[in-house]
A protein has these predicted regions:
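Residue-level detector of short, conserved catalytic/binding motifs and their immediate flanks
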Residues: 63, 125, 165
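Short, compositionally stereotyped local motifs that mark structural "simplifiers"
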Residues: 1-87
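Short, solvent-exposed loop/turn and secondary-structure capping segments
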Residues: 47-48, 76-77, 139-142, 211-213
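Alpha-helical cap/lid subdomain in secreted, periplasmic
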Residues: 152-166, 175, 181-225
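N-terminal secretory targeting modules
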Residues: 1-4, 83-160, 189-193
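Conserved beta-strand elements of the Class I
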Residues: 128-130, 168, 198
């Protein structure tokens, strides 16, 4: 009698820093964990960001996660609640850094993040544009293949406006403030000049879910990075 293989799953644990660590168990090599934090309304986890690093979230935060192969879930959705009493004032989502994958049809968020980190390390830019699709679709590096024609709306004006500067485009389509905060805390500024100028244009994609004050708090957190 042939012994069946163990079913895939996800192990959730806390590291010494109190961050949530998610580990895929018995999973195929191409499987990825997708997750969200404090989702107030049901969202399809297949469009949420990949788990790429331990999750920083306040006590009481709800982290949903599921293992996917492509966009098909291969484990049931699970929820982990961060231990400890929740703060008296709920921490807005704009201050909880997380990944996303809402624009997966035209670009890969995680791959663009890796490319941006590499370019910043190698070129030591002195001008960085941090934003969402309005910035992303302008021009400049990194370039998302194979959709260059869709995502590079005006490379000529980018070249004109950044002439003489080592500029990097840190705009990511459909990013909310908390997604940019995650990116900056995970390497996208590592290697930039100490006196680099950062141009921040964020918040549009938060308007449906956050108050103006919450968006402002998140933008301030981004600027402090």
């Amino acid at each position: 009698m042939t012994e069946s293989s163990p079913s895939p799953g996800i192990r959730a644990s806390l590291n010494e820093a109190g961050e949530l660590v998610l580990t895929a168990m018995n999973a195929p090599p191409e499987a990825v964990i997708r997750m969200d934090v404090n989702a107030d309304s049901p969202r399809m986890l297949c469009t949420q960001g990949r788990y790429l690093a331990p999750v920083q979230a306040p006590p009481g935060a709800r982290i949903r996660f599921r293992l996917f192969r492509g966009k098909r879930g291969i484990t049931p959705p699970e929820t982990f609640i961060m231990p400890g009493p929740p703060p008296a004032r709920a921490v807005p989502s704009t201050l909880i850094p997380c990944t996303q994958d809402r624009d997966f049809m035209i670009y890969d968020w995680a791959s663009r993040h890796e490319a941006a980190c590499r370019i910043v390390r190698e070129t030591h830019p002195n001008l960085l544009f941090i934003g969402d699709s309005i910035t992303h679709f302008w021009g400049g590096a990194p370039v998302d293949e194979p959709h260059r024609d869709i995502l590079q709306k005006s490379p000529e004006t980018w070249n004109l406006c950044t002439a003489g500067m080592r500029a990097v485009n840190l705009g990511f389509g459909y990013d909310r403030v908390e997604n940019a905060l995650w990116r900056l805390r995970h390497g996208e500024l590592d290697g930039a000049k100490d006196n680099a100028v950062c141009v921040v244009l964020l918040g549009t994609n938060n308007l449906a879910e956050n108050t103006d004050g919450e968006i402002l708090e998140g933008i301030r957190a981004v600027c402090r990075e």
